[in-house]
């Protein structure tokens, strides 16, 4: 009996000194919004217009409604009992389907997409927009988000290999629609991005993010392949992913991440490099 009591005492001592597992983020679907919730998120949740739009090429200087946007519908396929795995199916007006498997962890959300063109004709779906709203995260009231630029100093991307806060050098102000800012990777034609002001500088990688209102946390996101990085007009940030058009019968895989992590930039970059080795070669 004494031996058993000793074992039990040791077990409880270990339990006391071991940190509790960090609770997972959870997912919900509310209208066209993907909602990420967790006590670790400033403001308690992130809301994402998911997806805001599927887009055609030739979009940089084109009418957003009459040319660029391809209409689509979105269907909730399933949500796991623990609200950690959510599956969606998007159907584009031209017949393309996109299956989404979205998985929440303690400090990230993982996106795995399969786009397929079952039709006899080539699809014009070239890129798409997940629009992440960041008012609460950056310490502002969502009611004041319209065309707000007060959050810009909280936001960053990477230029010449260094974290660069917004507004970046050579901030553009002219475009079909203003305000906002677009950064186009070297691999993407500059004619095929958002019709907002296009910055002449090329980002060093595909990571874009911001610091929380108290500077203790970072939100960041990346996709592969990616079409653009974008600072929008309602306190939003985008890494918009590329489809590149799908031939008849073609299937493509796309993946993405949202990170919600402590404000350790070096640790974030190491994790990003592991998740997206294509971006750091």
Enumerate the predicted regions with their spans.
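Beta-strand-rich recognition/accessory modules
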Residues: 21, 78-80, 89-91, 179-281
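Residue-level recognition of well-ordered beta-strand positions that form the cores
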Residues: 89, 101, 112-116, 131, ...
């Amino acid at each position: 009996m004494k031996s058993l009591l000793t074992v039990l005492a040791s077990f409880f001592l270990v339990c006391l000194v071991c940190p509790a597992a960090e609770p997972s983020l959870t997912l919900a679907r509310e209208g066209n919004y993907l909602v990420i919730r967790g006590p670790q998120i400033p403001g308690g949740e992130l809301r994402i217009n998911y997806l805001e739009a599927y887009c055609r090429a030739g979009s940089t200087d084109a009418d957003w409604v009459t040319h660029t946007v391809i209409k689509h519908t979105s269907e909730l396929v399933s949500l796991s009992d623990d609200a950690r795995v959510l599956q969606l199916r998007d159907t584009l007006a031209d017949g393309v389907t996109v299956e989404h498997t979205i998985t929440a962890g303690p400090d990230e959300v993982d996106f795995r997409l399969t786009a397929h063109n079952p039709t006899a004709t080539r699809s014009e779906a070239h890129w798409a927009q997940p629009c992440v709203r960041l008012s609460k995260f950056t310490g502002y009231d969502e009611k004041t988000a319209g065309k707000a630029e007060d959050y810009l100093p909280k936001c960053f991307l990477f230029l010449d290999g260094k974290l660069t806060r917004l507004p970046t050098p050579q901030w553009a102000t002219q475009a079909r629609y203003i305000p906002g800012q677009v950064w186009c990777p070297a691999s993407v034609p500059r004619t095929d991005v958002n019709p907002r002001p296009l910055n002449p500088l090329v980002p060093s990688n595909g990571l874009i993010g911001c610091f929380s209102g108290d500077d203790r946390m970072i939100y960041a996101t990346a996709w592969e392949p990616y079409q653009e990085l974008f600072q929008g007009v309602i306190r939003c940030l985008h890494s918009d992913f590329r489809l590149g058009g799908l031939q008849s019968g073609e299937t493509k895989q796309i993946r993405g991440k949202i990170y919600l992590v402590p404000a350790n930039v070096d640790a974030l970059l190491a994790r990003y490099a592991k998740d997206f080795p294509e971006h750091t070669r």
